[in-house]
Regions:
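Acidic, surface-exposed loops and disordered segments
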Residues: 1-217
Length: 217
């Protein structure tokens, strides 16, 4: 697609290497492993046995059975499993194959509780701003009409979250044993989309590991 290769004298030759955008497709499709890319060394690109791929029906079942859970067992998730999930997530599509989404895993209960309370406090603060007619108009300039309308649809959201918090509930992370935070460079094109795609890959992989998930934010 990028015009890097041309067929000359019956052979594929890299004639415009400067056009390479690092997608790895050339390494992927070569039937005889003749292309060894600096960014995709062959030893790190094992051949995939297509016979082991799930059928369309199996994949559809996985997608249908995945559910967003808000009740979790009080059982730690082994860190090697978390690492495997993060590793799988990067195979989600990304702009220019940047694979620029990084993950922070938090499994410390005190830290998760602190993050949950901070989120409740921030939502309460934002809810108060949305109830002020002048500030609501100013926020519309930054957030846009639709997002402002959505954010202001429940002006009591912050107080409702605080009420649940004071009753000993976790209205943000639902007492999950692990919180995974995906992040990428904010000014990069399609950064948010890339993070969402990676998150969904991770959630499907977690489902096959017997782990429930819920995407927050």
């Amino acid at each position: 697609i990028a015009g890097v290769f041309e067929i000359r004298d019956g052979a594929s030759v890299a004639v415009r290497p400067e056009r390479c955008w690092g997608c790895g497709q050339c390494v992927s499709v070569c039937p005889v492993d003749a292309i060894d890319h600096d960014a995709f060394p062959l030893e790190k690109c094992p051949l995939v046995d297509n016979g082991r791929q799930p059928t369309a029906e199996q994949l559809a079942i996985l997608m249908r059975t995945r559910r967003s859970a808000r009740t979790f067992a009080e059982r730690p998730v082994p860190r090697d499993i978390v690492r495997d999930l993060v590793s799988v997530s990067r195979w989600g599509p990304s702009a220019q194959n940047s694979q620029d989404v990084d993950w922070v895993a938090i499994d410390d209960r005190a830290r998760i509780t602190e993050m949950s309370k901070a989120t409740v406090d921030e939502i309460r603060r934002f809810s108060r701003l949305m109830r002020h007619p002048v500030l609501r108009g100013v926020l519309r300039l930054f957030l846009g009409r639709e997002l402002t309308k959505s954010a202001g649809s429940n002006p009591r959201a912050g107080e409702e979250l605080l009420d649940r918090w004071t009753r000993g509930l976790d209205p943000i992370f639902y007492n999950a044993p692990v919180v995974l935070v995906g992040h990428t460079r904010s000014r990069r094109a399609f950064a948010r989309d890339d993070a969402i795609y990676d998150a969904y890959n991770l959630m499907l992989a977690a489902e096959r590991q017997g782990l429930s998930t819920c995407q927050i934010g």
